[in-house]
């Protein structure tokens, strides 16, 4: 809540991915830049994608929805949408800089509000369509473009002990993110 309400609303600092690009292009290290560097770029080297499960405010809201376990397997082809979102956010902020738009701080604040509204509405819509609370995380979240490559080198990650695994599939049935631990 601190990052979402205090930094985002009261301090008017965009904590979404667009805010990260904005402050990075400015060459300033505001809270958004530091947050992305620690939690989403270098943090996954230690904790994997722990951010998603324990600290993401979008996932927190989506976890109140009734679909704790996905009803169907993940639709792998839709995962490309997260990279489209990632590139769109980069392109949008880049365009604002290249066009030398005035009042960029005010625009970034409204982008923060609109971005969060879009994330929550699309997350709820996807959850209802796919009957999966974390459908937004799996298919649309642009932050995973940072998290995914770094988490491959993570020190802390879920592993399957092949000597004890009976390949019953129960772990996959109860995992909200469809993580296939035995692969």
Question: Where do the model's predicted regions map?
Answer:
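Non-ligating segments of multi-cofactor redox enzymes
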Residues: 1-182
């Amino acid at each position: 809540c601190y990052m979402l309400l205090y930094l985002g609303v009261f301090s008017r600092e965009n904590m979404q991915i667009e805010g990260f690009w904005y402050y990075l292009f400015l060459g300033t290290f505001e809270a958004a830049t530091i947050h992305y560097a620690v939690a989403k770029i270098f943090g996954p080297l230690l904790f994997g994608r722990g951010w998603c499960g324990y600290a993401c405010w979008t996932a927190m809201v989506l976890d109140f929805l009734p679909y704790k376990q996905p009803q169907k397997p993940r639709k792998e082809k839709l995962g490309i949408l997260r990279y489209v979102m990632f590139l769109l956010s980069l392109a949008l902020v880049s365009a604002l800089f290249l066009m030398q738009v005035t009042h960029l701080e005010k625009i970034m604040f409204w982008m923060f509000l609109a971005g969060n509204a879009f994330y929550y509405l699309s997350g709820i819509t996807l959850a209802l369509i796919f009957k999966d609370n974390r459908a937004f995380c799996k298919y649309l979240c642009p932050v995973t473009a940072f998290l995914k490559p770094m988490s491959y080198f993570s020190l802390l990650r879920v592993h399957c002990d092949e000597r004890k695994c009976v390949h019953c599939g129960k772990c996959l049935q109860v995992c909200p993110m469809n993580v296939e631990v035995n692969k």
